[in-house]
């Protein structure tokens, strides 16, 4: 059975009861993209008290007419992009599972055909949402996901991939009806063109350069965009419900009833409440856990407890602890560590504590500590990523890796490959910091965050430490960026918004809302809600309270930058210069022989831009780089047939304002070389000939506009 639904600028076609019928399968089409979403569950419940949900998102190479690269020509482990999309689907759907649901459940989304224009993340979430709604798992309504962009100052709903390239905002929102469940946002920087005059070995050039806008969003702009998203989500959720409610399977599922133990609850509250409250309020994280364990053992050893199971005692103790934490916050405005609701934990900062690293920062906030290290490299160090919707691999020049070892929370667990959580936290920090790093910065940058101690907000500590580590490595970042994690306690129509939450408040609270940005606005945010939805007024308070906390942290970070001493000795050196683009082939040599010899001889790395004639040499010592540059200049100026610049000719009889009927001898990306007389050329900059379709040997009337350093620049005669 097929349904075609027109919602939120998209035409979505769903086939139900057609494929994967042993599970609940939905085939969704949008444009030329085809996605299969399936939901399957086990018949037996798990004993543990958690939601056993697994989400997998798989992009098939054949969907884009590709064969997987590498030695193994098939899909193997998921890429980082696939893992992050799976996390988005998981975080959007998880809050809607009913309390007491304990059946192992798997949601699989497979991309079978990929249209480069279609947003696969939004499409995949909506396909998974419909499949879940059609299953026998009780869901109150289908989830809907949307993306909001901003082009020319206007918010647009569900931009396609081409439009997103020109957007200054990427806001992904999921919700059900009028409730928001999950938010991911990042600011997208753009470049502003400027003209500058630069002197180069081949020719002085008036060229285009760029400056970068971070495009942070204000709190009011975020709320405006979320309002647009909320309306679209309501529209989509209603449309899915109307189309598919009559096809939903009857639910025969038994939910686990939470077994109440009023006698245990009364006993603990009457006899141990003061001890529990003392443990919560007066202890550090590790001491608190130890003290609560002592209380549990004391109860278990009592004669009265012999009639109660250990599980019921521990569960009831956890409930009492949760209740006391929440009541204290709501009724007294006081948190477990004594802070007020909007207070940030004490912060300490040390920079460049690792003598041989390019840049480092030890950022400590309360009992959360991140060691963030910046490393600079050449173009060959960039991460190559093969995306399904891109024809060729793309180069990632700014990387953030987040590591969370077990010892950071006092656990004796082996350190393994990064999991979904590590990838997600690293991606959030990258999104927050990326707008502050100029895209034209010549070095590849890798930030590594080692979480040494964790008691909440470790991803935001990574953002703060990362921004300072960039400064410590001498990276000219546009602005400092800081992040803060916000929390929410909601009970009986009373609520409290918490700034800089610790682990206890994250675990026993109702929201995890991370906000990062500069003093001028927000660069990234992420929200996960446990309530089943949040209203705009609460969201507004959280955003403005986060701004207050963020600026407080940035003020401390600004003071710390005054103490930074960049270790120039360990930083890589780089030289960027231009040659005649036609000479790039001489630098490379036959089958790359010449460039390999240069790299081996001088111990440097070399990157070439054939179109612009740019040469980038990187190395550890200035002497090596200078020697390699001189060697390359010698190659490009000594090849047979090389046309030498005007500085090698006698230009003493040329004057400003002289007019010539010249001949176009060569066309380069930055302009045209026009022969004036006696083999002397003048440069006609590209900005002066945008409206012309020039060709070599074309006759052109020009006049001299500048003579400098033996070189001539010309303009067109009017």
Swiss-Prot record:
Reactions the enzyme catalyzes: RNA(n+1) + phosphate = RNA(n) + a ribonucleoside 5'-diphosphate
Cellular compartment(s): Cytoplasm
Any GO CC annotation of this UniProt entry: cytosol
Top-rank EC class of the record's enzyme: transferase
Domain S1 motif: 657-718
Gene3D superfamilies: GHMP Kinase, N-terminal domain (3.30.230.70), K Homology domain, type 1 (3.30.1370.10), Nucleic acid-binding proteins (2.40.50.140)
Alphabetical list of SMART domains matching this protein: KH, S1
Single GO BP term: mRNA catabolic process
Enzyme Commission numbers on file: 2.7.7.8
GO molecular function term, any single one: polyribonucleotide nucleotidyltransferase activity
InterPro entries recorded: ExoRNase_PH_dom1 (IPR001247), ExoRNase_PH_dom2 (IPR015847), ExoRNase_PH_dom2_sf (IPR036345), KH_dom (IPR004087), KH_dom_type_1 (IPR004088), KH_dom_type_1_sf (IPR036612), NA-bd_OB-fold (IPR012340), PNPase (IPR012162)
UniProt signal peptide: none
Highest taxon of source: Bacteria
Binding positions (Mg(2+)): 506, 512
Domain KH as annotated: residue spans: 572-632
Cofactor(s) needed by this chain: Mg(2+)
Keywords carried by this UniProt record: Cytoplasm, Magnesium, Metal-binding, Nucleotidyltransferase, RNA-binding, Transferase
Function (record text): Involved in mRNA degradation. Catalyzes the phosphorolysis of single-stranded polyribonucleotides processively in the 3'- to 5'-direction.
Family: Belongs to the polyribonucleotide nucleotidyltransferase family.
HAMAP family (UniProt xref): PNPase
Protein name: Polyribonucleotide nucleotidyltransferase
Name of encoding gene: pnp
């Amino acid at each position: 059975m097929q349904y075609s639904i027109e919602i939120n600028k998209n035409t979505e076609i769903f086939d139900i009861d057609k494929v994967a019928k042993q599970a609940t399968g939905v085939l969704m089409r949008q444009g030329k993209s085809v996605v299969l979403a399936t939901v399957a569950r086990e018949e037996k419940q798990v004993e543990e008290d958690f939601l056993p949900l697994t989400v997998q998102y798989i992009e098939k190479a054949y969907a884009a007419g590709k064969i997987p690269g590498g030695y193994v020509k098939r899909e193997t482990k998921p890429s980082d992009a696939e893992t992050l999309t799976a996390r988005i689907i998981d975080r959007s759907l998880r809050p809607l599972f009913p309390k007491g649901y304990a059946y192992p459940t798997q949601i699989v989304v497979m991309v079978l055909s990929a249209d480069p224009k279609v947003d696969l993340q939004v499409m995949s979430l909506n396909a998974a949402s419909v499949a879940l709604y059609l299953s026998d798992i009780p869901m109150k309504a289908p989830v809907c996901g949307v993306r909001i962009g901003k082009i020319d100052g206007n918010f647009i709903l569900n931009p396609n991939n081409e439009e997103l390239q020109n957007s200054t905002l990427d806001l992904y929102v999921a919700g059900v009806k009028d409730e928001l469940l999950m938010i991911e946002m990042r600011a997208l920087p753009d470049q502003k063109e400027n003209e500058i005059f630069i002197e180069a070995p081949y020719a002085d050039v008036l060229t285009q350069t760029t400056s970068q806008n971070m495009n942070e969003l204000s709190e009011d702009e975020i709320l405006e965009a979320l309002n647009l998203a909320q309306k679209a989500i309501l529209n989509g959720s209603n449309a899915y419900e109307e189309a598919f409610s009559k096809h939903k399977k009857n639910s025969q599922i038994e939910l686990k009833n939470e077994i109440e133990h009023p006698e245990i609850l009364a006993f603990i509250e009457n006899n141990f409440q003061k001890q529990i409250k003392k443990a919560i309020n007066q202890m550090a994280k590790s001491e608190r856990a130890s003290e609560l364990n002592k209380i549990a053992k004391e109860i278990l050893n009592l004669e009265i407890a012999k009639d109660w199971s250990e599980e019921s005692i521990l569960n009831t103790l956890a409930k009492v602890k949760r209740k006391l934490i929440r009541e204290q916050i709501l009724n007294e405005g006081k948190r477990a560590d004594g802070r007020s609701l909007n207070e940030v934990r004490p912060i300490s900062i040390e920079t460049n504590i690792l003598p041989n690293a390019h840049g480092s920062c030890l950022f400590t906030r309360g009992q959360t500590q991140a060691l963030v290290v910046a490393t600079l490299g050449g173009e060959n160090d960039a991460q190559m990523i093969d995306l399904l919707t891109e024809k060729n691999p793309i180069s990632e020049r700014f990387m953030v890796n987040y590591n969370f070892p077990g010892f950071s929370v006092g656990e004796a667990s082996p350190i393994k490959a990064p999991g979904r959580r590590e990838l997600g936290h690293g991606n959030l920090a990258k999104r927050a910091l990326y707008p502050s790093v100029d895209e034209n910065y010549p070095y590849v940058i890798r930030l590594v965050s080692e979480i040494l101690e964790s008691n909440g907000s470790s991803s935001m500590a990574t953002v703060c430490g990362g921004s300072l580590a960039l400064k410590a490595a001498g990276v000219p970042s546009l602005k400092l960026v800081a992040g803060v994690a916000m929390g929410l306690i909601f009970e009986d129509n009373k609520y409290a918004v918490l700034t800089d939450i610790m682990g206890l408040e994250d675990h026993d609270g109702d929201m995890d809302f991370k906000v990062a940005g500069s003093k001028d606005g927000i660069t990234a945010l992420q929200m996960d809600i446990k309530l089943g939805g949040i209203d705009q007024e609460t969201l507004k308070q959280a955003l403005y309270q986060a701004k207050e906390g963020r600026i407080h942290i940035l003020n401390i970070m600004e003071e710390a930058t005054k103490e930074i001493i960049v270790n120039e000795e360990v930083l890589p050196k780089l030289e960027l210069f231009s040659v005649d683009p036609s000479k790039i082939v001489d630098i490379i040599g036959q089958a790359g022989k010449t460039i390999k010899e240069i790299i081996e001889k001088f111990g440097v790395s070399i990157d070439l831009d054939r179109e612009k004639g740019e040469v980038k040499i990187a190395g550890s010592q200035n002497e090596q780089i200078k020697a390699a540059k001189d060697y390359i200049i010698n190659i490009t100026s000594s090849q047979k047939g090389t046309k030498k610049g005007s500085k090698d000719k006698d230009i003493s009889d040329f004057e400003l304002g002289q007019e010539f009927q010249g001949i176009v001898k060569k066309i380069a990306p930055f302009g045209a070389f026009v022969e004036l007389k006696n083999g002397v050329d003048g440069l006609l900059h590209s900005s002066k000939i945008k409206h012309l379709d020039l060709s070599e040997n074309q006759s052109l009337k020009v006049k001299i506009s500048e003579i400098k350093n033996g070189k001539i620049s010309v303009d067109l005669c009017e």
